[in-house]
A protein has these predicted regions:
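Phosphate/pyrophosphate- and phosphate-bearing ligand-binding catalytic cores of soluble enzymes
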Residues: 4-5, 11-17, 147-306, 322-336
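Anion-binding (especially nucleotide phosphate/pyrophosphate-binding) glycine-rich loop
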Residues: 1-143
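A common structural junction motif
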Residues: 42-46, 316-323
Length: 336
């Protein structure tokens, strides 16, 4: 078990915010996680459970303990199920699936972060969400040290939400996630510009490797590398609005993109609305909006969490003024 004091979290958040925590603890097994929670009973520190930090905005120093998983492994349990340690890199899991003819995860290629976070955030892209794959989540209860095995339905997944993100927040240390894949390849090509990108390559029926590479190329073209430009990927969730609201806006904006959710709701891309407000490529101090994708906020160098908060709240205000729609961060802010 690794323990550090007055520890910089700069390397533990992709936004590149240099915030410190009072104490940093990394556990590398279920047994160490249980030992850790027993020691926490004797203390009264505020807690932050931290994964890869790819979906986190640190708004200041944290006077508490950061708990970080170092449990990193992958194993195939049976023909369709794969179990990963909570610290196993998400895209390495996707790569494993593709190379072992296990299908379903390929549309989630090169999403940053770790497998444990997939069970918290219900990450998603191109018509697929983690909830479509998650079979079981193993977690240690902080209050008791007991190991629990939660099935998919227990976690109450919805768009970028789960019980781990809400009522179970800071109550469990996720130690592993088991995913159920498919041995039958049924590619999903109709979300975003996947089919158009394949057509440019002269590919009509892509192999899973070709689909993964195409999605990787699409994402790399519009999303900045956090090793070069601090960011947390898509900053805002795409709002889901009533059909009547969509029709009202569609009458004003003929080319407004949208995705039908059901008979009564439509999803409108937040990035499109932000771009319509003139924010694409613009900055507010050392924080800005990426010039290739308006949904991504970036650290232009030396930005604090407060700088990013000021930017995203200004964008929220402008979108609400122009479209009458509230957009909410997908990224978690802490301390909040």
């Amino acid at each position: 078990m690794k323990i550090e004091h007055n520890y910089s979290l700069l390397k533990h958040n992709t936004f590149g915010i240099d915030a410190k925590c009072q104490r940093f603890v990394e556990y590398e097994s279920v047994e160490e996680a249980q030992e850790l929670v027993r020691s926490l009973k004797e203390e009264d520190y505020p807690l932050l459970i931290l994964g890869g930090g790819s979906n986190l905005l640190l708004t200041g120093d944290f006077k508490g303990t950061v708990l970080h998983s170092g449990i990193s492994f992958i194993e195939q349990i049976d023909e369709e199920r794969v179990r990963c340690g909570s610290a196993y890199v998400w895209d390495d899991f996707v790569d494993y699936c593709v190379s072992h003819d296990l299908y379903g995860a390929e549309n989630l290629s090169i999403i940053p972060g770790e497998c444990g976070a997939s069970a918290v955030q219900n990450i998603g892209a191109y018509g697929v969400e983690a909830k479509d794959l998650i079979d079981e989540v193993e977690a240690v209860e902080i209050a008791t040290g007991e190991v629990h095995h939660f099935k998919n339905a227990d976690c109450e997944y919805s768009y970028r939400q789960s019980k781990f993100k809400n009522e179970w927040r800071n109550k469990y240390l996720i130690t592993s996630v088991t995913y159920r894949l498919s041995k039958t390849y049924q590619p999903k090509l109709d979300y975003g510009n996947i089919r158009a990108a394949l057509a440019e390559q002269g590919i009509e029926n892509p192999t899973v490797a070709e689909l993964r590479q195409t999605i990787t190329d699409i994402r790399n073209a519009k999303l900045p590398d956090p090793k070069k430009i601090g960011n947390a990927g898509s900053f805002f969730m795409n709002p889901i609005v009533p059909k009547a609201k969509y029709e009202e806006l569609a009458a004003q904006y003929e080319r407004m993109p949208h995705y039908t959710i059901d008979a009564d709701h439509e999803k409108i891309p937040a990035g499109w609305m932000i771009e319509q407000c003139g924010w694409k490529g613009k900055a507010l101090g050392p924080a800005g909006v990426y010039d290739k994708q308006a949904l991504v906020l970036v650290n232009l160098g030396g930005a604090t969490g407060a700088d990013v908060v000021r930017l995203y709240q200004t964008i929220q205000h402008d979108v609400k003024e122009k479209f009458g729609i509230e957009i909410h961060p997908e990224v978690n802010t802490f301390p909040n």
